[in-house]
A protein has these predicted regions:
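Membrane-embedded alpha-helical bundles that constitute the cytochrome b-like, heme-associated redox core
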Residues: 1-231
Length: 231
């Protein structure tokens, strides 16, 4: 196995692990505060590792032509960096287990910041995944027989269903209120099975992956059309 192939596998593994942790972190009350802190640390470590593995892209941000797609990708990445940093710092301030001995002040502000940034992390990271979804589709397409295009249409239909339910779950789970800061406290139904909770959040993630993917395709098409006109 080539070095490039090994690095690609590590990248996929890291990104998959981040996706799982992101979903679990959203169920703060259901997994317990101590577990939430450990998962948060794990997420931060994986986030740093993700940037190390993708350092070539970071170095090339200011190089080349600035298209709408690149601008969308870069702005999303910068916002994720900001919200993740705020989540990590505010999480350390609020810690009652791992960093409790530090006795950091500012808990009230940290609680507001942690809640806002936590939900924006979820949305932005889902969009980020959607931006790169074409690459994942490309990898999966190699496994699908070319003489069976029906499988691609089934996959597209399934993604539309997930995104459609994601709209409902987005509203039902009150994410607009959490993202806007209108609601300062998160409500959890303690009797609800965590599986149902996670399924709703998977659907919401699917919604933003869907939006990120097709918006990225639209921006690429706009750039392609401009290039054709100029020729």
């Amino acid at each position: 196995m080539s070095k490039a192939r090994k690095i690609q596998i590590i990248r996929i593994t890291v990104d998959a692990a981040m996706t799982v942790l992101l979903l679990l972190l959203m169920g703060y009350s259901k997994i317990g505060e101590c577990a939430h802190e450990w998962l948060g640390i794990g997420m931060t470590v994986l986030f740093v590792l993700h940037h190390i593995l993708n350092r070539k892209w970071i170095k090339s941000v200011c190089k080349g032509k600035c298209t709408l797609y690149r601008l969308f990708q870069t702005v999303t990445a910068c916002l994720i960096l900001l919200t993740m940093l705020c989540s990590a710092v505010s999480g350390a301030i609020l810690s009652r287990y791992i960093f409790a001995s530090l006795n950091l002040g500012g808990a009230y502000l940290a609680r507001t910041v942690h809640m806002l940034c936590g939900y924006w992390d979820f949305v932005l990271l889902s969009l980020h995944l959607g931006i790169h979804w074409a690459m994942i589709i490309g990898m999966l397409s190699r496994k699908i027989p070319k003489n069976k295009p029906i499988l691609k249409w089934i996959a597209r239909g399934f993604s539309i269903l997930i995104a459609g339910y994601g709209v409902y779950a987005f509203i039902f789970r009150k994410l607009p209120e959490y993202l806007s800061g209108v609601t300062q406290f998160i409500f959890f139904d303690e009797d609800e099975p965590i599986a149902l909770f996670l399924l709703d959040y998977i659907a919401v993630m699917g919604l933003f992956v869907f939006v990120g993917h097709y918006f990225a395709l639209l921006l690429k098409q706009i750039h392609k059309s401009k290039g054709t006109v100029q020729k």
